[in-house]
Regions:
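Charged DNA-binding/catalytic regions of mobile-element recombinases
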Residues: 1-210
Length: 210
């Protein structure tokens, strides 16, 4: 670095400064009871940790993957970057469409460096530990239904320590308003109700007027 040049920010600093404008995506593999290989595609927003899209296919391809971006990325949000690995599914044509059609700058991870897509890698591990490790998958439709319910729970009912702890969905941010109110005053007027998730594998709790 020459004298007078500004030092380049670290990757961690870049991600922290642009988190709400970055999405990351990845595939994970799930195996059914009949040993059929299914592929789960995930898109996550780094800033909120919210899962923007999740879908399943037995035959992943570039065109199918591009369609998932069309379904998962809202026009209301101005995303600028997408992180993905060097899987052959992410073809040059797909990346070109992400640049031209979505206005995204593609950030490729280095070869054989899963930690460079750490947000997705952690999400994949969470899905396995909290959901799929407890399930016997029957087929593609069954897996899709399980993930649909779990993603809803992950986004709207599961606290994340990295968020404060908080919950990814904007619709649930109003819970923060209750922090200034004492627990005793809330409990005197309401009762706690429980809602089972995935047949009782997890539960969500909420206040209900007494």
């Amino acid at each position: 670095m020459e004298e007078g040049d500004e030092p380049r920010p670290s990757t961690a600093t870049f991600v922290r400064n642009h988190a709400t404008a970055i999405v990351a995506c990845d595939f994970m593999v799930a195996v059914t009871a009949k040993f059929q290989m299914l592929y789960v595609f995930l898109i996550v927003e780094l800033g909120s940790r919210r899962i923007l899209h999740c879908n399943v296919t037995a035959h992943p391809a570039a065109e199918w993957t591009l369609q998932q971006f069309r379904e998962g990325l809202s026009d209301e949000r101005d995303y600028r970057f997408v992180i993905h690995d060097r899987d052959s599914i992410f073809s040059a044509e797909l990346d070109q469409e992400l640049r031209q059609g979505f206005g995204l700058r593609v950030l490729l991870t280095p070869p054989q460096s899963p930690k460079a897509n750490a947000f997705c890698e952690r999400l994949v591990g969470t899905i396995r530990r909290e959901c799929l490790d407890f399930m016997i998958l029957l087929n593609e439709s069954h897996l899709r239904g399980i993930l649909r319910e779990w993603v809803q729970h992950y986004n709207s009912g599961r606290p994340h320590s990295s968020l404060g702890p908080g919950i990814p969905d904007d619709a649930h941010k109003d819970r923060a308003a209750q922090r200034g109110t004492s627990w005793q005053s809330i409990a005197a007027k309401r009762q706690v109700i429980s809602r089972p998730i995935l047949g009782g594998l997890h539960h969500e709790y909420a206040w209900k007027a007494a």
